[in-house]
Amino acid sequence: MPILLFLLDTSASMNQRSHLGTTYLDIAKGAVETFMKLRSRDPASRGDRYMLVTVEEPPYGIKAGWKENHATFMNELKNLQAVGLTTLGQSLRTAFDLLNLNRLVTGIDNYGQGRNPFFLEPSIIIVITDGSKLTTANGVQDELHLPLYSPLPGSELTKEPFRWDQRLFALVLRLPGASLVEQEQPPAVQFDESPITAMCDVTGGRSYSVTSQRILNQCLESLVQKVQSGVVIHFEKSGPDPPILEDGLTDPVRSVGSQPWHNCHKLIYVRPNPKTGVPLGHWPIPESFWPDQNSPTLPPRTSHPVVKFSCTDSEPMIIDKLPFDKYELEPSPLTQFILERKSPHSCWPVFVANSAKYSELGHPFGYLKASTALNCVNLFVLPYNYPVFLPLLDDLFKIHKNKPSLKWRQLFENYLKTMPPYYIGPLKKALRMMGAPNLMPDSMEYGLSYSVVSYLKKLSQQAKVESDRVIGSIGKKFPQETGIKVRSGSNALSLALRKDFKQLLQEITGEVPQRPMDLNMKEFAGFQIALLNKDIKPQTFRNAYDVPRTNLLDHLTRMRVNLLRSTRQFLKGQDEDQAHSIPIVQMGNYQEFLKHIPSPLRELDYDQPRRLHTFGNPFKLDKKGMMIDEADEFVSGNQNKHKRTGEPNMQGVPKRRRCMSPLLRSRPQSPAVINNHIGGKDPPISVNQVSPDLPKPVAVHKNTDLSNNATVNEATENHVADHFCDDLLITKSEPFGTLSSAALEATEGYAAEKDSNFRPNDISDVFLENTKETGDNESCLPNNNAAFTHRKRRLQQCRSYEEANIELKAQILKEIRKPGRKYGIIFTLLKDVQGDLQTRLLFLQNVIQEAARFKKRNLIEQLEGFLEEIHRRASQVNHLSSC
């Protein structure tokens, strides 16, 4: 995942215009967008991460960092303005610290345990500047200086502020202000002579001198090709030059003095695995010191390892199944020199100075070798001191047949003493892959000293805190100054040098009365000049001089209208059309507008206690359309105790169940209608399709009046009947309706009086008597009990018996929910059920189901006995009528 960090010079000098009419800052913004378009052509660009840094003071200069998305990056890029100084050194340090923010947390640098090229975070910093003088608060600088102090923990472990996988490139804008005759340009873009060029060379990058738009596009295409995964290594020649060329003659030119290929600061490509997309490797590049277990700290390392190569030709050594790493070198004078020798079968060993314990140069850890096709040069990384180790391995497998002798073990132990201890882990893994896992004991492990481990762990924790602080500060705006401080231009004179010195002495001694103090604003320490706030519009009605000359007549008319208008209304400082006139750039900024409008939903009232379930598990979620089926099994007599999952209802209609009543079984299959449509718009549903089941428990509305049509619309019931009122409109599907509070109180009072001498079987006669069909305009039957007079009066106002049954079921449900075993009022209310016998039986079935939901077993037994009595008497009536 390459990281592309753009460092844009936003100093005041970027406001200068080119011959194209655009400012340098606009050209820089366009260059960033063009680079992103060119980069998007590569499929590997999906994992790119873009960051944006300016030359403002940290942390305000960080516009887009680790957490910001692409939209934030583009928005911050468009809003950049060219103000301030050219503090390029401080901004570069900020950019490097931003890239190194998480390296200690992830352990990618692997301090003290070798450098792993396959542990990398490739980053490219692209600086776009005008190449003018570097200005700071202390003055003008001729050279680029990066601050030595860094607030980032662990920065002392590396001498330079950058790392070996970070490269710096600079686009120095040199576009003229006047159009010139375009001269013939050289084929290659020239380096720039600005101070940033030296910094680019140190990191492995380069600078570009941009003199025209065509060269800018050429530079951007070159930068896109520079986005490669790799690390920078400093190659340095050790020893004499190769004496003989391919033709057998010496080269007199290259044998005198230092040549460019003697010291190269170039990149080695670390290709990611095509399957995983992550680079893989086996062997590290050795450290430039021998690790000491007694050392409390680690010596600081250089950003780029210094790899020395010897020009002595040797044969490349490779053993079957031995893992090795192969890295291609970036084209450089060194690769050109090696390829010109045309010797693909010879190699030059490479070393790291002071990596061995007793040798200054160290032992070889790999070699440089030209490819067979002579088109590139590769760096092969092998085990440390491979000229000694590889012959030992060859003898082990070919001569000893993987059974080492005592002499071989002694040679192997001597080799281990010359190898840095951080090679133990990779060597164990390699031997395991080759089929010799027991050569090195498991007890042989390498680890840093306890003090170093504690130190690194402490640095990692501090780096995590610093990372959170920096990430949290990104996006904050620089605090605007309230005013410009005024300083006195001339130094204050001594009192003895003032002309009125004698008069001042007389005032102090009291000889002369004191003069009033003259207010001199220049001597006031806190005097400031207010800055003009562009966001605040001038109040032109306060100051006539703020009104433009072209708007005087319009402004006078507006002030006259406001003067004659009633004082109850707000004054208007602008026309209504002008209030909606905004620049085109701000028309699409909906997010800022949405922040100022009130929320359509009110805030939650946290003071009110949250309503819990009144039945069952209080932690159970309210599942819509889910039913508890244990009650069904209890009523139907099924002894299966296993729960089954309920099914969602079709438009609130429960799943069909087998009817328990023999009268209902023998009922002809006439399609009854279920009143479950909403607002009376949906078609009625046949009973052949669905049958009533346990209704869904919902809240029962209080203080409603069924005499009003609105109340009828709120009280609905899954009720089955043969005939329905055509004009009955139900607008809300609920299981039960409600009675008025007066009727409920009257019913409860009657139940308290009559419950002592209640007998359920006495009601069966009354329940069975009302068997005649009820029409649409049929009124409810009156009851002789005086306690129910008020309720009966309300029932007589109902337009159909369905509404009366809705009221009854609401009352019965309320009685079922009450604790205790006094069920007299329930059976009393059952006498008032209206409709034919089939409707009454279905009503009774629903009551039994509700009782089962609340586990009222005693009530269920009485209701079932009541149902059997009705069946028995109904059969007697049918027998007498048949006779």
Swiss-Prot record:
Predominant place of localization: nucleus
Domain of life: Eukaryota
Residue ranges constituting the VWFA domain according to the UniProt record: 3-227
Subcellular location: Nucleus; Chromosome
Motif (Inhibitory loop): 626-633
CDD domains for this protein: vWFA (cd00198)
UniProt feature coiled coil, ranges: none
Keyword annotations from UniProtKB, A to Z: Chromosome, Nucleus
InterPro entries: INT_SG_DDX_CT_C (IPR029307), Integrator_subunit6 (IPR051113), VWF_A (IPR002035), vWFA_dom_sf (IPR036465)
One protein family per Pfam: Beta-barrel_INTS6
Gene Ontology cellular component annotations, sorted alphabetically: chromatin; INTAC complex; integrator complex; nucleus
GO biological process per UniProt: protein localization to chromatin; RNA polymerase II transcription initiation surveillance; snRNA 3'-end processing
Keyword Nucleus: yes
Any GO MF annotation of the entry: protein-macromolecule adaptor activity
Entry annotated with the keyword Nucleus: yes
Gene3D superfamilies referenced in this protein's UniProt entry, alphabetically: von Willebrand factor, type A domain (3.40.50.410)
Comment, domains: The inhibitory loop acts as a regulator of protein phosphatase 2A (PP2A) activity: Asp-629 and Glu-630 residues mimic phosphoserine and phosphothreonine residues and bind to the PP2A catalytic subunit PPP2CA active site to block substrate-binding.
Subunit structure: Component of the Integrator complex, composed of core subunits INTS1, INTS2, INTS3, INTS4, INTS5, INTS6, INTS7, INTS8, INTS9/RC74, INTS10, INTS11/CPSF3L, INTS12, INTS13, INTS14 and INTS15. The core complex associates with protein phosphatase 2A subunits PPP2CA and PPP2R1A, to form the Integrator-PP2A (INTAC) complex.
Family: Belongs to the Integrator subunit 6 family.
Function of the molecule: Component of the integrator complex, a multiprotein complex that terminates RNA polymerase II (Pol II) transcription in the promoter-proximal region of genes.
Protein name (Swiss-Prot/TrEMBL): Integrator complex subunit 6-A
